[in-house]
Amino acid sequence: MRNVMKATTLESRFPLLAVEHGCIISKDADITAAFEVELPEVYTVTAEEYEGIHATWCKAIKVLPDYSVLHKQDWYVKEEYRPDWKKTGTGFLARSNGMHFNERPFLNHRCYLFLTKTTRERMRRQSNWSTLCRGHIIPKEIRDRETVLRFMEAVEQFARILNDSGHIRLRRLSDDELTGTEKETGIIGRYLALSPGNTDCLEDIAMSAEEMRVGSNRLCLHTLSDTEDLPAAVETDYRYERLSTDRSDCRLSFAAPLGLLLPCNHIYNQYVFVGNSDEELRRFEKSARNMQSLSRYSRQNAINCEWIEEYLNEAHSQGLKSVRAHFNVMAWSDDGEELKRIRNDMGSQLASMGCVPRHNTTDCPTLFWAGIPGNAADFPAEESFHTFIEQAACLFIGETNYRDSPSAFGIRMADRISGKPLHIDISDLPMKRGIITNRNKFVLGPSGSGKSFFMNHLVRQYYEQGTHVVLVDTGNSYQGLCEMIHRRTHGQDGIYFTYTEEKPISFNPFYTDDGVFDVEKKDSIKTLLLTLWKSENEPATKTESAELGSAVNAYILKIQQDSNIVPSFNTFYEYLRDVYRKEMEERYIKVEKSDFNIDNLLTTLRQYYRGGRYDFLLNSAENIDLLHKRFVVFEIDAVKDNAELFPVVTIIIMEAFINKMRRLKGVRKQLICEEAWKALSSANMASYLQYLYKTVRKYFGEAIVVTQEVDDIISSPIVKESIINNSDCKILLDQRKYMNRFDQIQSLLGLTEKEKSQILSINQSNDPSRRYKEVWIGLGGTHSAVYATEVSMHEYLAYTTEETEKMEVRGLAEKLGGDMEAAIRQVAERQKE
């Protein structure tokens, strides 16, 4: 069947001539430099930062020569997440996570910038002069070599201004990225097909009075092309109420409703036409005089004169540059009903900005044509309005999606808006970039905020990437995960130690595999003995610390010389009682009992010696081999209220970790202390804690303290000095419980107002269709964001701390011979039904 419609080939009307040296050259000899723009992540920018970004745009636009066009093009396209199974991992939970997010829809954002040098004649032309309906003549001016060189210098200066701002990054697009290759479609081809990815064939473009089509997609266009359509005032940003509270602000750019908050396929085009400002103002002066002379015939002329005078006064008094601007939102869909919904959504979003929604069908073809990368000079002049650079820049999109970290190492979290999985590195890349100086982390979250759930998620992923994990827990939070690892590794990892009367935890602090006792090992033994001897509020004197250190040194020397002596607390106690005390008595310079009371020391330590009530604790016959166990949990809930045992058990576990830390070279080590950190906060333990936190970074390790009580951290100066000040990564969960006293937390943790606003926005506007809780992660006081901890049902059942759910899974696992994975699968299937 023959096509009876009026038709022509794309080639005959195509406005572009060539792409050379990273520049697009049109058939009218306009030259365009193209960039990809990297904007700040959404919900992470403050009002002050938005003002800084706005000022940067204004400064950059001012360096462009006369008769230049800035065309900023933001693409928002619906895509589906596809996991990279090679990177996802082979573990049961890792693969279930990948399956959970497979085909998750999200709105992907790409931002491009096109800077075009054209001529005065081209900038004045209207839609009837579009290349859609005329031939091409190369103007003489653009053939001038000096004009081109000056423009390219201005482009370089423009890019340097934006890149130096610290908020925006520009990357020049190559020839292949513009035109495409055999395997990849270029940006020009993607625009003509309205497809963000590779396209195998070109689409027909149909233009009529009623609608415009690209392939099977019908376009819907809303324009801001007249000052009457604009709000009375524009700003750099606005308060986003859904994530704000009466104590905090969440800010978005003024044009954000036309960006990520508009959930459909669309392109937001932003144009600024830089002409000769002085010439424009002179033309306005002439127009004002004409209006003034005609004002006696029409009140409207008098009003127009007044408006023009106000515009001129503003320009001259503030030194502003007059430009023209245009903004349009172009959406598309192949479904007619969906397009109606999109049209309503676009109108609502424009209205929320204070704009008049103008659905433009007449100019859709010429505006689509002008939107071709490199063809901004073909824009119809009648579709633009006069304004100043400062006002035009307020309508630029200022934020983008959360980005994946380029690091190979990291954890998987989720985007706040769509739930798209994100790969973020909170350990290695921030260290390399100098954002943090250590990998230590401080985690604060009230009961029920998802703290243990998040920590399970974090340590599981660290473990699967080769980390040696040691956990000190007081609530069985990691039991399910530990048992799964134990089963999967056939007992090599997933070691779970718990304290019971029948089988108490026992250690031997004087044992080393190679018989080597370095300074750190000796200091840890001395600290342990001081903890056993002194009460929590009774600090040791210098003499007591020195004498105890000397006794430890002398005992170690003796066991190294005499292999018949079995290293243990029993033999140390005997050495202290029978040998060291006698040596003290024979010294020329006597030590007074008031300075070092060795009898008091022996009396206090006797309960840990043979026959004492705690003689099992420090005299283990077989050393616990933590060295090559990659996932070890110490569950010490049974002794957490025992004032004598709790500090001892905790410090010995810490000492065991330090041994692991020193001996495993080039291997990531991670120590997680839940509420057990309280045992380390006494005066005698302060130096030990400071040592651990300051030293662990040198051994490719990180210490993580997890707590839920604000009062604990506020009342403990040790925590502030040792833990918080040496933790460059801070992780906070839902703090609404403490909203009225958050100023204390803010002061203690040294949080900025920006970080405070982010933290108080946690869980304020969660999607009810998804099961997740949000968490704030701050790095070095300069980089921070809120992420969603969303997991699969299988992961949820492995991490859950709900008693009924744990009992259901564990009960079924026992029936299946201890197979936690099989039990989780069955319970998950039941819940789906």
Give short role names for the model-derived ranges.
Residues 427-449, 453-460, 469-478, 495-503, ...:
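Conserved P-loop NTPase motor cores
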Residues 133-161, 356, 445-450, 798-824:
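Short, cationic low-complexity segments
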Residues 85-90, 127-132, 374-377, 484-489, ...:
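Short secondary-structure boundary/capping segments
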Residues 1-399:
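Extended, folded cores of ATP/NTP-driven motor/assembly subunits in large transport
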Residues 100, 516-571, 717-833:
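P-loop NTPase motor core of the ASCE superfamily
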Residues 23-29, 102-107, 317-322, 414-416, ...:
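Short glycine/proline-enriched loop/turn "hinge" motifs that connect secondary-structure elements
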Residues 40, 47-63, 260-262, 355-356, ...:
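P-loop NTPase motor domains
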